[in-house]
Each structure stands twice: as structure tokens, then as C-alpha cells.
Amino acid sequence: MQNGRFINYETAIKKLEKYCSIQERCRHDVIIKLKKLNFFKKNDQIINYLVSNNFINEERFTLLYCNGKFSIKKWGRIKISYHLKQKGIDNIYILKSIKKIPEKKYIETMIDLITKKTKAIKEQDSYKKNCAIARYLMQKGFETDLIWKLINKNSK
């Protein structure tokens, strides 16, 4: 029911083709869109159609999602994995896409975030300052052991 009326199968397909063409989508996104369109019949059939016609490709989606969240939002591996799992993405695709993040770039991003956060924190006590930086990076989804290793290295 869209604006008080029901939509048919063909209309749902057309809307979802357009929806998937605008931006990379996963099954979870399409199911949510179907619910917003109030279209509850033949959902599996629609999703199978979109997959077979390459409108939905979970591997491609995972790779682009991972790359975007790391490059643009500066998320760490943990947060990216968590959000992909929330979308119901297969663990194989998650691991594959996370491994494609270059280790050097990952460390450089963490160091940049540490540097920016260090400048922003007014705290004089180095222990409290380091704890605040660590909390910030943990919220971004970076690994705790790597965080402390880099904080200790940068504070020397």
C-alpha cells in the first residue's frame, strides 16, 4: 500500500530495480523497502529475481560497504563486521572484504585519528587522555590491542 493503495508485483519489481540501481543494496535493505511499500507477497520471488539479474550481489555490496565505511567514516574492522552481520550478510563475504583493507592504510588511519583526538582533548593527565583516545577508537570499531599499542607508541 503506497499512499493508501496496494501495488502489484510488476510495480514492486520496477521500484526495486530502480532502488537497487541507485546504490548498492543487500537483501536486508530490499526486504525493508518491500515492507515500506507494504508489499508482503512473493518477497522471495522478487529477491530471487533481483539476485538473478544482478541487482543484488551480496559480495559486491559487502566489498563496497566495507570500503566506504573505512575510507569515509573511518570505521574499524569490528564495527564494519558488526553492521554487516546486522544486515544478515554471510560471514564469508564479511571476512573476505575486511581482509581487503590494506594493513598499512588501516594503521595510518588509526594514527591520524589518535593525532586528531589528542589535539582535541584538553585533559592534562596523560592516563586520562590516553583512556579517552582509546574509548574513541573503540567506538569507531578498532581492535583494543592495536589501539593501545599505537597509543603507547605515539605517547613516547
Each language-model region and where it sits:
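An alpha-helical, amphipathic repeat domain used for nucleic-acid recognition
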Residues: M1-K156
